[in-house]
Amino acid sequence: ESPEISAKWSNELQKRAETLPYGIPINLSSDPRNGAKDSGAEFKSGGSEISKWPEGVGFAACFDPEVAGQFAKDASREYRALGITTALGPQIDLCTEPRWMRFVDTLGEEVEMSKKLTKAYCDGMQTTEGEADGWGKDSVNTMVKHWPGGGTGEAGRDAHYAFGQFAVYPTGNFEEHLKPFTEAAFHLDGPTDCASAVMPYYTVSYGVDKKNGKNVGNSYSEYLIKDLLRGKYEFKGIVCTDWGITQDPEKTIEGFGSRCYGVQDMTEAERCLLAITNGVDQFGGNSESGPIVEAYKIGCEKYGEKAMRERMELSAKRLLINIFHCGLFEDPYLDPEESAKIVGCEEFCRHGYEAQQKSIVLLKNSAKRAPEGQKGVLPLKKGLKVYIP
């Protein structure tokens, strides 16, 4: 929809929030929406009147963190003008498996470049210039994904479907996939210091948990969330599950449904409790509070009411901090006319077009590298000078 309509919708939501107990503002989130071409995939939507930029792997092709940083600065202004205060990204998976359908949104496969781009992206999104701690009216929380690295799917199969549930490490490079998180997103150069949220992926990181020997979805793994993310790497922000991991699984392996991998025998409430005790704060895509209330009751019986209340209040604190970051308690409302001037403005569109140009990679159809009996790597028509796939 148009920026004006988005701004009006945001204002109406915030008005409604004011009437509820405690009057806590709404923190709206969005998947990437500035791609030059809408992917058409179920996990991503384009923006109709927003500036257009390269996809994640296009930023990698620029070999220039400043381009990613400029995008993040411009996109954060557009997001705020639309009422969005959390970006479900950047997607900082090292894409060592090029057959994965989400390759396009990653920042490439090279760890050092990915780290530089991650820092530039998160700093640009989260930082409001002139604010001592970086947080302010132009800030958008970043939710880096997918812990502990989603570019590891077996044979490139995608974990939105049960046939892609396993992440594998045939060369033993698990730690390499952590580096964009542990050496970049959690140690930013800018004043906000750290990405404010993390999203674990659906996958079962097969054989990684040597402590408990459990092969379960990442959010259900005590080792990956409690011991590594919260413990060893001391991440203090929000942990939000990927979308739809708590419901019962689909009947067929091809079904696009719940991804409760490894904990299918539990009830939904038991799954919620397991994730909460690991250190998860938020359940992506869940709109029913019933299973979480039931999880709390089970937890009170198992751990005691005092312990469960303290645990729930800790998550509440983390969630509230990200709302305070963006100044929503001070003023959550937008001026629709001002939003229309910001979103897709000439300056941002020019920056996006320049980035698209810089991301283009020219390949030579070399005869030296061609298969036997072929005049080039690609079997193109004779006399063709330029080929655009």
Place the predicted regions along the sequence by residue.
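Glycoside hydrolase catalytic-domain context in secreted enzymes
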Residues: E1-P389
